[in-house]
Structure formats: structure tokens, C-alpha cells
Amino acid sequence: MEYDDVKVKLSEIEELLNTLGKKHPKEISAFSRFLREVAETKALTTREKELIALALGISAGCEWCIYLHTQKALEAGATKEELIEAGLVAVLMAGGPALMHLIPLMKAIEAFEKEHGES
């Protein structure tokens, strides 16, 4: 998967939130406030929270969540090995279906590495 394909998935999240924000401003505003509050660094670092969110996204089978939280975890300093290990924890907890959702994780890692000139 190319980085442009991942960017399309990420832009779909933004489009959804913008569309819903116009039709359901109270709900999306409340969700955004909750998101900011939870994202604030307290006992867990941003990196740790993003790795948890990634594992939960894999367990839930949410491809958009996988791309978003892979990106955010990398931005927070997570390594490729940490991303894969978080994915394996998801598989441990959610079984075979979660294993199949390591496919988008691996594609996201590859796409972000290509974008940043890593391999």
C-alpha cells in the first residue's frame, strides 16, 4: 500500500467528522472534548496510549483506526517493533480475526516508512 492510499483513509476520517459535525455538532463536540481529555498525558505517555489504541483498533477490526493510530504512535516515538508487538497483543486477546488485521498494520508501517525514506 502506498502512502497516498493511507492518506485517503486518513482523510476519510476527517471528512466523516466534518460531515457529522455539521449535522450533529453537540455530539461531535462532546466526543472531541472527551478525546482531548483522554489524550492528555497523565499516567500514560502519548506513545503508550497510541499503542493501546492501535491494539484496540486491531481487535475491533477498524482499518481506519489502525492507520490513524499507527501514524500517531510513530509520531509519538513508537518503533516498528513496538507497533508489531502491540498488534500481537491484540491477536492474543482477539484471536484469528485480529491476526488478519495485522495486514493493514503492516501496510501502514510500510507506507509511513516509504514516506519518511526508511526501510
Residue ranges and their predicted role:
Residues 84-108:
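C-terminal structural segments of small proteins and small subunits
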Residues 31-35, 51-58, 86-93:
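Short alpha-helical scaffolding segments that buttress acidic/His motifs in well-ordered protein cores
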Residues 68-80, 106:
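Iron-sulfur (Fe-S) cluster-binding segments and ferredoxin-like electron-carrier domains
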Residues 77-88, 113-119:
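Charge-rich, acidic-biased intrinsically disordered regions
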Residues 47-51, 82:
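Residue-level detector of well-ordered alpha-helical segments, enriched
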Residues 62-65:
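Short cysteine clusters
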Residues 46, 56, 60, 96:
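Short, conserved micro-motifs enriched in small and acidic residues
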Residues 1-48, 101-119:
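Acidic, glycine/proline-rich low-complexity segments that act as flexible tails and inter-domain linkers
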